[in-house]
From Swiss-Prot:
Pathway this chain belongs to: Nucleotide-sugar biosynthesis; UDP-N-acetyl-alpha-D-glucosamine biosynthesis; N-acetyl-alpha-D-glucosamine 1-phosphate from alpha-D-glucosamine 6-phosphate (route II): step 2/2; Nucleotide-sugar biosynthesis; UDP-N-acetyl-alpha-D-glucosamine biosynthesis; UDP-N-acetyl-alpha-D-glucosamine from N-acetyl-alpha-D-glucosamine 1-phosphate: step 1/1; Bacterial outer membrane biogenesis; LPS lipid A biosynthesis
Annotated positions binding Mg(2+): D108, N230
Record-listed UDP-N-acetyl-alpha-D-glucosamine binding positions: 11-14, 25, 78, 83-84, 144, 158, 173, 230, 319, 337, 352, 363
UniProtKB keywords: Acyltransferase, Cell shape, Cell wall biogenesis/degradation, Cytoplasm, Magnesium, Metal-binding, Multifunctional enzyme, Nucleotidyltransferase, Peptidoglycan synthesis, Repeat, Transferase
This enzyme's EC code(s): 2.7.7.23, 2.3.1.157
Linker as annotated region, ranges: 233-253
Transferase in keyword set: yes
Note accompanying the cofactor annotation: Binds 1 Mg(2+) ion per subunit.
The protein, known as: Bifunctional protein GlmU
PANTHER family attached to this UniProt entry: BIFUNCTIONAL PROTEIN GLMU, NUCLEOTIDYL TRANSFERASE
Role of this protein: Catalyzes the last two sequential reactions in the de novo biosynthetic pathway for UDP-N-acetylglucosamine (UDP-GlcNAc). The C-terminal domain catalyzes the transfer of acetyl group from acetyl coenzyme A to glucosamine-1-phosphate (GlcN-1-P) to produce N-acetylglucosamine-1-phosphate (GlcNAc-1-P), which is converted into UDP-GlcNAc by the transfer of uridine 5-monophosphate (from uridine 5-triphosphate), a reaction catalyzed by the N-terminal domain.
GO molecular function: glucosamine-1-phosphate N-acetyltransferase activity; magnesium ion binding; UDP-N-acetylglucosamine diphosphorylase activity
Organism (species): Rhodopseudomonas palustris (strain HaA2)
Length: 452
């Protein structure tokens, strides 16, 4: 069977005024990934699949994000907002380039799946001219109704134009559409603007196709999958749906989530086998978790690689650039950033490790700080294999602690320490016998009321 080519046009020109944000609507995140990125990741991206993204004026950030996800993306600007068909024809050059299937999607529908795009194309393979994605709405008020006759799409009826019987229809238009690429440019060009708003509506393509004796059809999907995001409340709703999906997928893959509804995952989180995550854990973008890892409650992890059988938290914060080797441990109230912590190393309590490399089997005592920033630049701390850093130590970078070296508790280390050496930097202890008794007696005498 010959593989069909495709062109997906993603409409992302909306201002998103109801978001009340300076950030373009399609760049707001769901599960740590911009809305647009979810759509582009789901769109066909094989050898014969092309992508065009239609953006608004002054939306260079949207173009940059599109090319970050899909370097092959063609960018087109819709200078005027004159309806959905007008937006599609902003990419007229791409449509004219030819493809077997033209897919039209929206940059603010992050829950759409690759499987749905594939199902949308199937009727075109079987001779259909146009396919609309529909959903059964719990409350269809405000949606265009899909009027189906003899298993074919007869019309898309907007609510204001619907008859009483048509208003009872719960099958609604999701806006996503597929058109036979051979007729796409002709059909789109035939759409007029003879309506109250003077705009060009993509939904008119259904009538044009039927007038030409061609077949229009409907593919149904779940209502959640085609949620459009126009407000912060809708953004939160989409986040909830996405999180439920991600948790379910993680558990299906063998991850133990002790209290799933309290755990936040990112769209790109990857898991090994037998991973356990306790309640109230937040995992941001860029995290990979190895076999047997345990993440304890109230930990926050971003852009981090965890090796096999690692242990994190509770109350740990792992910031970007952190990597842990197999069996390494990060304990409670520990923060790391740009830190490589090798196999078997332990950082158990109340510690900051930034811009550092900790060798295998090293032990970092409670209250240790790598002093990595001098007010202008960051500097690196190197701690060798098997080194032992005593509690309440400050390691002033750049500095190297040799393999097997010991650092005495309370030390401020400013110079390199050789392998297997002991470094202690603190004043000699002074003991004054009886001082506490004399101090208390003097204070009590001072508190006696004066004779008067």
């Amino acid at each position: 069977m010959t593989t069909r080519t495709s062109l997906t046009i993603v409409l992302a020109a909306g201002e998103g005024t109801r978001m009340r944000s300076s950030l373009p609507k399609v760049l707001h995140p769901v599960a740590g990934r911009p809305l647009l990125a979810h759509v582009l990741a789901a769109a066909p991206h094989g050898e014969g699949d092309k992508l065009a993204v239609v953006i608004g004026p002054d939306h260079q950030a949207v173009a940059d994000e599109a090319r970050r996800i899909r370097p092959d993306a063609q960018i087109y600007v819709q200078t005027e907002r004159l309806g959905t068909a007008h937006a599609v024809l902003a990419a007229k050059q791409a449509v004219a380039g030819g493809a077997d299937d033209l897919l039209i999607a929206f940059g603010d529908t992050p829950l759409i799946s690759a499987e749905t795009f594939a199902r949308l194309r199937e009727p075109l393979r079987n001779g259909g001219a146009l396919v609309v994605l529909g959903f059964r709405a719990v409350d269809p008020t405000g949606y265009g109704r899909l009027v189906v006759e003899d298993d074919r799409l007869a019309a898309i009826r907007e609510q204001a134009d619907a008859s009483p019987d048509e208003l009872k229809i719960t099958l609604c238009n999701a806006g996503v559409m597929a058109i036979d690429g051979r007729i796409a440019l002709d059909v789109l060009g035939a759409i007029g603007n003879a309506n109250k708003k003077g705009e060009y509506y993509l939904t008119d393509a259904v009538g044009i196709v039927r007038e030409r004796g061609l077949v229009a059809g409907v593919i149904e999907t779940d209502e959640d999958e085609v949620r459009g995001i126009n407000t912060k409340a809708q953004l939160a709703e989409a986040e909830a749906v996405m999180q439920a999906r991600l948790r379910q997928a993680a558990m299906a893959a063998g991850v133990t989530l002790i209290s799933p509804e309290t755990i936040h995952l990112a769209a790109d989180t990857t898991f090994g086998r037998d991973v356990t995550i306790e309640p109230f854990v937040v995992i941001g973008p860029g995290v990979s978790i190895g076999d047997g890892a345990v993440i304890h409650s109230f930990s926050h992890i971003v852009d981090t690689s965890l090796g096999k059988n690692t242990s994190i938290g509770p109350y740990a914060r792992l910031r970007p650039g952190t990597s842990l080797g197999d069996g390494a441990k990060i304990g409670n109230f520990v923060e790391t950033k740009a830190a490589q912590i090798d196999a078997g190393a332990k950082v158990n309590h109340l510690t900051y490790i930034g811009d550092a490399h900790i060798g295998p089997g090293a032990n970092i005592g409670a209250g240790t700080i790598t002093c990595n920033y001098d007010g202008f630049n960051k500097h690196k701390t190197e701690i060798g294999a098997g080194a032992f850093v005593g509690s309440n130590s400050s390691l002033v970078a750049p500095v190297r602690i040799g393999a097997g070296a010991y650092i005495g508790s309370g030390s401020v280390i400013t110079r390199n320490v050789p392998d297997d050496a002991l470094a202690v930097e603190r004043n000699d202890q002074s003991v004054r016998e009886g001082w506490a008794t004399r101090f208390r007696e003097a204070k009590l005498r001072a508190k006696k009321p004066k004779a008067g």
